[in-house]
């Protein structure tokens, strides 16, 4: 009976560890919807401009987070395929409508939800929004900006 109890406790512990791993590395377990996969196929085919539009809650923001995240990681963690950008340093910009609602309320939580914990370092801007994300392994970055910022700030890096 003790052996059975030990095994049951071990099973519960392993299930807890797996759930924790999945939560911290959600991008590895990303399963694209059909319309998301079609968009990924276009990106992976080298298309320079791709548009995914549609109703609320169809996964547009999620897809944006995993595409930008995989570009910064240098690999698509959900299928282990290389990205079209390879493992080189990439600099990504996400243009938000505003800092408080869109950047801080939508984009930052989605990036945190999908990007693997411990693989990036975040810095806040002067407003307190986590607007600069750096991936030390690749040197890649994600910079959040708003469309209300002066045009000069959007020019170049």
Give short role names for the model-derived ranges.
Residues 1-157:
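Phosphate/NTP-binding elements of NTP-utilizing enzymes
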């Amino acid at each position: 009976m003790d052996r059975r109890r030990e095994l049951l406790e071990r099973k519960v512990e392993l299930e807890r560890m797996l759930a924790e791993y999945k939560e911290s590395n959600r991008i590895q377990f990303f399963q694209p919807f059909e319309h998301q996969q079609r968009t990924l196929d276009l990106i992976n085919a080298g298309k320079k401009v791709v548009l995914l539009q549609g109703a609320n809650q169809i996964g547009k923001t999620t897809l944006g987070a995993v595409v930008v995240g995989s570009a910064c990681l240098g690999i698509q963690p959900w299928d282990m395929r290389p990205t079209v950008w390879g493992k080189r340093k990439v600099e990504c910009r996400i243009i938000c409508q505003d800092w408080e609602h869109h950047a801080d309320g939508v984009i930052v939580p989605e990036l945190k939800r999908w990007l693997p914990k411990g693989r990036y370092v975040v810095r806040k801007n002067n407003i307190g929004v986590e607007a600069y994300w750096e991936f030390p392994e690749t040197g890649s970055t994600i910079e959040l900006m708003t469309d209300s910022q002066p045009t000069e700030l959007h020019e170049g890096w």
